[in-house]
């Protein structure tokens, strides 16, 4: 009598696993846009992601937590069970912020992935809305955008050129680190609070870049 329920459960397992994999793939696709949709996807698929990463949530978004995004020793968290996403193994998540003065503010978030940038780019390509915009430069892959009148405009990558305080760039970047790839989004340069509200709902207002007046008062 117990055989039928057991068989039914066994038949359900592959479909459940497939649904979980599809949820992870959907979130990585959202991540590749380098905007707030990544955090909305983490919220929508939080049941799948909580098996792999520490999550915090609010009404509309969720995010993977690190101890301190401003600290080298606290801005990375290892992922449990090596989530299989689009045929790749994600090893850890990082969330970094740096104030480089006249060079600009830099916010990075993303994953360390097992494999080379070539391998990761091949797996990531089908998830990208415009894969041709991801350009190979030496051993890395780069997709660059410039903020212009509240819109993002695709530009040719400018390695070695810092945006400073005069412009804002958004970059999807695949870089080699040994046998692994650092898959990151970044927003950099003249980043202000209004932009972070749009792109990074996980960052609290207390960590927004300060204006010159706010720094002077502080």
List each language-model region with its residue ranges.
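Short, surface-exposed beta-edge/turn micro-motifs
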Residues: 9-10, 108, 179-182
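Short helix/turn-capping signatures at newly exposed starts of structured segments
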Residues: 19-109
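Long, charged/polar, surface-exposed segments that mediate recognition or autoinhibition
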Residues: 81-157
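Bacterial N-terminal signal peptides
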Residues: 5-14
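Non-cytosolic coordination micro-motifs
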Residues: 122, 126-218
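Short, extreme N-terminal segment that most often corresponds to the first beta-strand
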Residues: 23-34, 111-112, 185-190, 213-216
